[in-house]
Amino acid sequence: MNSETYWIISSNNWDLAESFGFNTNILETNLINLAVVIGVLVYFGKGVLTTILNNRKETILSTIRDAEERYQEAIEKLNQARTQLEQAKAKAEEIRVNGVLQMEREKQELIKAADEDSKRLEETKNLTIRFAEQKAIVQIRQQISRLTVKRALEIINSRLNLDLHARMIDYHIGLFKAMKTSAE
């Protein structure tokens, strides 16, 4: 029986169901019904839509603020990096200039030391030459003296005879006597 009742109810409602549907023709639809539906949607959906839009707006603004903060941080880091780069360039230039100056100082010191060594060597050479000259002069004088004495002895020995010898002795004795009388 249940199934018959169900059939009767459903067959009675079938006619009603055939008349239910959407009318897509805008001219045949009731504008009041549409206005009511839209009004209900606006009234009840306004809060939800406003909340969703506000949440979306806050999310976008938060994202923009975060992006701006990261942008500012990136700019600060970039400026710091540029400052450090400029400092590094300045330090490198200072090191280069100091290196060039140090190299120039060392070059001048080496030149000065080489000049001093050259002067010292020149003085040593001149002293050595003068010493060698003096030594040669002394040796030549000694040799000349020896040769002169030898030659003089040869001449004296060749000319010396008893008569000359006696005359020289007499001459020197006379000189001695003259010195003795002038001293008295």
Curated annotation (Swiss-Prot):
Bilayer topology term: Single-pass membrane protein
Would the keyword Chloroplast be found if you checked this record's keyword annotation? yes
TM stretches of this protein: 31-53
State a single Gene Ontology molecular function: proton-transporting ATP synthase activity, rotational mechanism
Q: Which Pfam families match?
A: ATP-synt_B
* Primary residence: plastid
Q: Tell me which InterPro entries the record gives.
A: ATP_synth_b/b'su_bac/chlpt
Q: Name one GO cellular component term.
A: proton-transporting ATP synthase complex
S-S bonds: none
> Which keywords describe this protein according to UniProt?
ATP synthesis, CF(0), Chloroplast, Hydrogen ion transport, Ion transport, Membrane, Plastid, Thylakoid, Transmembrane, Transmembrane helix, Transport
- The reply to whether Thylakoid figures as a keyword in the UniProt entry is yes
State where the protein is found. Plastid, Chloroplast thylakoid membrane
**Job description of the protein:** F(1)F(0) ATP synthase produces ATP from ADP in the presence of a proton or sodium gradient. F-type ATPases consist of two structural domains, F(1) containing the extramembraneous catalytic core and F(0) containing the membrane proton channel, linked together by a central stalk and a peripheral stalk. During catalysis, ATP synthesis in the catalytic domain of F(1) is coupled via a rotary mechanism of the central stalk subunits to proton translocation.
Subunit info here reads: F-type ATPases have 2 components, F(1) - the catalytic core - and F(0) - the membrane proton channel. F(1) has five subunits: alpha(3), beta(3), gamma(1), delta(1), epsilon(1). F(0) has four main subunits: a(1), b(1), b'(1) and c(10-14). The alpha and beta chains form an alternating ring which encloses part of the gamma chain. F(1) is attached to F(0) by a central stalk formed by the gamma and epsilon chains, while a peripheral stalk is formed by the delta, b and b' chains.
Q: What else is on record for this protein? A: In plastids the F-type ATPase is also known as CF(1)CF(0).
Q: Which PANTHER family match?
A: ATP SYNTHASE SUBUNIT B, CHLOROPLASTIC (PTHR34264:SF3)
The record's similarity note reads: Belongs to the ATPase B chain family.
Protein name as catalogued: ATP synthase subunit b, chloroplastic
Organism annotation: Staurastrum punctulatum
